[in-house]
Structures are given as structure tokens and as C-alpha cells.
Amino acid sequence: MSGVVADTSALLAALFAEPQRDAVLVALSEADPALLSSCCLLEATIVAQSRLGPEGPAELERLLEAFNVEIAAFTADHSAMACDAWRRFGKGRHPAALNILDCCSYALAQASRQPLLAVGQDFARTDIELVELIG
């Protein structure tokens, strides 16, 4: 597999042992590179601490290190792409109902021309290429 952009939903599915955990881990292990928006790192860290307590961020960091996930800085170009994604697919505007951080993942996938690794159906209602999760 080529590179992927990981959405927060995929990382949290792996971290919290949700049903698609194994498929997400396979996709991450095959990705070269696996990218994560710095905005989504913030979101994942907050959710990890909220759900797992003080050890949550360290567990997330171990997951990111184990799969060599690269943190991509969120740039002005990404911001413009994310705004466009919100106009086209945002919550209250489109059935995909992307939130702000979904739009950040969308923008990084678009900018890097990599498929998006996500769990759930929101992104399937957009035009972004998705990683097919098997298993």
C-alpha cells in the first residue's frame, strides 16, 4: 500500500479496541507513509485522555510511534482546503456532516493525494478516496 492519511476516527478505533481495530492496524502497518494532521493529533490526545485518563496520551503516542505515523503541520493551504470541504460537505450543509476536524483530515488527504483511513460512513458521502478496511 502507498501512503495514507489517518483520521482521528481510525486512531481511536485502534486505541479503544473498537470492532475495526484490526483492519485499521493492518492499514497503518502497510502504509508508507501514514500521516496525521496536527489538528487531529490534538483531537485524538484530548479524547484519549478523556476516555483513558492521564495515561491516554502516552498510549496514543505509543500507537503513533509503533506505526511510524508522521505528524503533518496544518498549513494555510490546508486551511483553505478544509474551508472548501466544510462548504461542500459540512455539518448542516451536506449529508456527510463533516465537523471541523473531519475537514482537516479531508484537507490533508487532498493535499497529499493520499487515501483517507477513517472509520464510519461520513467520509463515504464525500468525494475523497478512502482506504478500504478489510476484516
Show the residue positions of the predicted features.
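Short, well-structured N-terminal submotif of metal-dependent ribonuclease cores
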Residues: 1-36, 49-62, 134
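Short loop->beta-strand "edge-of-pocket" segments that line small-molecule binding or catalytic clefts
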Residues: 4, 33-35, 67-72, 115
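A generic structural signal for short hydrophobic patches within well-formed alpha-helices
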Residues: 11-12, 41, 123-124
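Anion (oxyanion) recognition and catalysis
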Residues: 28, 65, 110
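Active-site neighborhoods of divalent-metal-dependent phosphate/nucleic-acid chemistry enzymes
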Residues: 70-115
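Acidic, PIN/NYN-like endoribonuclease modules and their adjacent C-terminal/linker elements
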Residues: 106-135
